[in-house]
Design a protein with these regions (language model features):
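N-terminal export leaders
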Residues: 13-18, 198
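C-terminal motif of bacterial Sec signal peptides marking the signal peptidase cleavage site
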Residues: 28-32
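Pocket-lining segment of extracytoplasmic ligand-binding domains
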Residues: 107, 187, 192-277
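Conserved C-terminal helix/tail region of periplasmic/extracytoplasmic solute-binding proteins
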Residues: 314-340
Length: 340
């Protein structure tokens, strides 16, 4: 293994752990201060809310709701802003009232909930499903001895970030294949360097997604498994808010989630609208936008899958403790137990 990969193994480095602790302490202090929990009114009399989106994608329904007038019909003026690159760091902005809603993924949210931050999921955005082709996955060199996730024992896997959903699904898939996830060495590398790392033999495999997955295949790498689709219902993107704001603004929150549900239906029926948002707001290559498989958007959170994720994240050491089951979902959030 090359020297630059040595320190970053299964868990975060001392520096990243310290940053995480500081962020959590700061968020806790902000929560104690209460923030501004009163919904503000825009100049036209509508209720003003701010949403922090991801910097990648999966935020398309937010812009569709704006463009199709679903927010306006609900009496809302919604400001959509790019949030933190690591969406798990959006919690402080929600807790201090800078934003009323923010995006993250299941692992990012559960880490906040496990630290007893007063945040609640209000809606899913997108979940893993067997209905569409995988948009993420494990890549190995052609001719590699790795033929299934079980073969990852004793191997080094490159990821763009440690401790998140991609590491979770890699460990989950290994466990499901009969392997021991604790015997995998995970290393963090720049997303743009992952494919080269496995091609050059610096790592045995990489877990990547979107256009980088396609580029890896085009470069001769072999995909193993079906990515996050191995756990249908796994929330890949969701929206959350603060418990205190929701308690005082339940009607506004319901208007927002209802408008988002309309946007989900519209996006699912009009994939060209999703591609248009990608073209305008992402840096994805034009060819990828034109040809990519667009996954279904949906509001319900699969509670059974969420419990599986919690249990396994604790077992894998990705969560120090399980969050209180009553501190995860907003009381009016849509749920399901029948993901496919």
């Amino acid at each position: 293994m090359s020297p630059e990969l040595q320190p970053l193994m299964r868990r975060t480095t001392r520096r990243s752990a310290l940053i995480g602790v500081v962020a959590i302490v700061a968020a806790g202090a902000l929560a104690a201060c209460g923030g501004n929990d009163k919904a503000s009114t825009a100049a036209d009399g509508t209720t003003a809310v701010t949403v922090l989106r991801s910097t990648g994608s999966t935020f398309e329904p937010l812009y569709i709701a704006e463009e199709q007038g679903f927010f306006k019909q609900a009496g809302l003026t919604v400001t959509i802003k790019a949030g933190a690159q690591d969406t798990s760091q959006n919690a402080p902005s929600v807790l201090n009232g800078e934003a009323q809603f923010a995006m993250t993924d299941s692992s990012g949210f559960l880490k906040a909930a496990a630290q007893k931050l007063p945040v609640r999921i209000v809606s899913n955005l997108q979940a893993a499903t067997t209905k569409t082709a995988p948009s993420d996955g494990l890549l190995v060199k052609k001719g590699s001895s790795i033929k299934s996730y079980a073969d990852l024992e004793g191997k080094t896997v490159g990821l763009s970030a440690l401790g998140g959903t991609l590491q979770f699904i890699c460990e989950y898939s290994t466990k499901q294949a009969g392997g021991d996830p604790s015997k995998i060495k995970f290393v963090a590398l720049p997303l743009t360097s992952l494919n080269d790392a496995v091609l050059q033999g610096k790592v045995d495999a990489v877990y990547t997604f979107a256009t980088f997955l396609d580029a890896g295949k085009a470069a001769g790498l072999t995909a193993i498994g079906i990515g996050t689709n191995a756990l249908p219902g796994l929330s890949q993107a969701l929206l959350f808010s603060s418990q205190s704001w929701l308690a005082k603004n339940a009607a506004t929150a319901k208007k927002f989630t209802d408008a988002m549900s309309k946007a989900f239906d519209y996006a699912n029926a009009h994939p060209e609208a999703v591609r248009a948002v990608d073209t305008k707001y992402t840096k994805l290559p034009a060819d990828y936008i034109k040809n990519r498989s667009i996954q279904e958007f949906s509001a319900p959170i699969d509670t059974g899958v969420m419990q599986t994720v919690i249990t396994d994240m604790v077992n894998f050491g990705l969560l120090k403790q399980a969050p209180d089951s009553n501190s995860i979902l907003w009381s009016q959030a849509a749920t399901t137990t029948n993901s496919q």
